[in-house]
Amino acid sequence: MLFRSSAGNPGAPAAAGGRGNNVNNRRYGGDIQGVREELPYLRSLGVTCLYLNPVFKSPSLHKYDTTDYRHVDDNFGYAGDLAELTGETEDPATWKWSKSDKLMLDFVAEAHRQGFKVVLDGVFNHAGSQFGPFLDVRQNAKNSKFADWFNISNWDPVTWISFGGRAGGNMPELKKDPVTGLAPGPRDYVLNITKRWLAPGGDASRGVDGFRLDYAQNVPRVFWVTYRKFVKSVKPDAYIAGEIWTPATSYLAGDAWDATMQYPFANAVQAFFIGGSQKPITATVFAERLRQFNIIYPFQVSLDQMNLLDSHDTDRWASRFVNANHPAPEDPNPTGRGGRRPYNTSKPTELEWQRMEQSIAVQMTYVGAPMVYYGDEVGMWGATDPDDRQPMIWKDLAPYDDPEVTFNQELFDRYVRLIAIHHRFAALQTGFAHTLLADDARNLLAYSRDLGDAHIYVAINKSETAQSVDLTIGPPDKDYAMIDWLDPAQAVVQNAAAKTPDERPQIQAVSRVKPAVTAHKGKATISLKPWGAMILAPASAH
């Protein structure tokens, strides 16, 4: 969320202050230039793709109530720049580029130069109440040329259906059509907006690299089939990810989306490592849930899935370990509104940080594309909106007013290491997954990622005692020496301060390192620390 990132442009509006601004609406001055200036930080973390929450013109903090899809919000760029534009209509031939738009395109160019892809939030199910076509409908009712753009339930007075099926409200839904998905007017507008940002001026190299589609299951599937064909004709390698909180097999058959924000993955990881309204699931159940993700979708889709643990719509991942017994389906709001049990927003303990790190090892090594919500890597915690959308913790802004708020260097280093491991091994990016062990009595889990003759072994001890486990791994006819890539004594992260514009941290085995584990003719004994994890592969492996 740009408002909560970093401020870099003195021409952008200042952050609001004072008691009159409640926490849901308060801005903190983050802007495009600020994110651009932090690209080296994101490189040092190992990130290769940036998904930005909505950047288009909108009156709100969250920007999911779009006023103008053609233009970047001037809060993120240059205040008042849209006033300089005149004569624009819904016709793309009339569209111009504001100074804030150009700043965004410059940002995309710089991000590309530094090795990043950029994915924007596409809010195409609904618009905002200040959206030009909707204002015209409010004024002219059924005589408006945009009368067929929205779900109007009554014309006198004008009454509409908003986001979530609510009557009225400030996010009017775009009209759906059983044949085309969206009514012709908004359908063409959405396609033209998509092309504008994918290929500015017809040049796909200057555009963004894809869209995350907000509340996408509420738009009929037939539209997404059209959308995919259109997007791939403009930019064949563009990424299309739908927001849906349940399995999405019908959308991931190769003719609609490339992937989803895979909330079922987050739910499975939480159910095993934390629990919720019920006690944690067993290792066997967890392994089967993970396996099912690779069965219900084509494997290429599974590789592309956004494997998140939390997001702007959930509580922070770290805080779930603090609230291990909090009912998962309930709103984890710190006030306990509606009679619900209050959420504990205390800072996680050392043990809770350790358990969080263990879960991240699974996120970074299982099938899919790991997605990190900003600030998780430095130890941000909190309940749901607005607590999960606090400003980013930056080292150069320390010390903070709250002495408990600090940049968690140990956690950051663990993220860097795990991401570097993910980048080093092709098997972790495109390899198949196989369960090696699921010991329910001892809370042990082990699996492999396999690509041809390359194998990466992951072992998890989800218990408070050290344990040893026998595994069948490695070739059956010879010894097979492996190091633990999670152990800083066995593998070091290099080039964290990138020397070239597109470089990322790399991990290398320590010279002449002794193996952590040696398999003898396919058999090995692995010793795991309490709440420990190991990632095993030969020292020379890639």
Protein language model regions, located:
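Active-site clefts of carbohydrate-active enzymes
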Residues: 304-349
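Active-site-proximal helices and loops of the catalytic beta/alpha 8
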Residues: 108, 112-116, 126, 135-138, ...
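Active-site rim elements
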Residues: 22-28, 94, 175-182, 212-215, ...
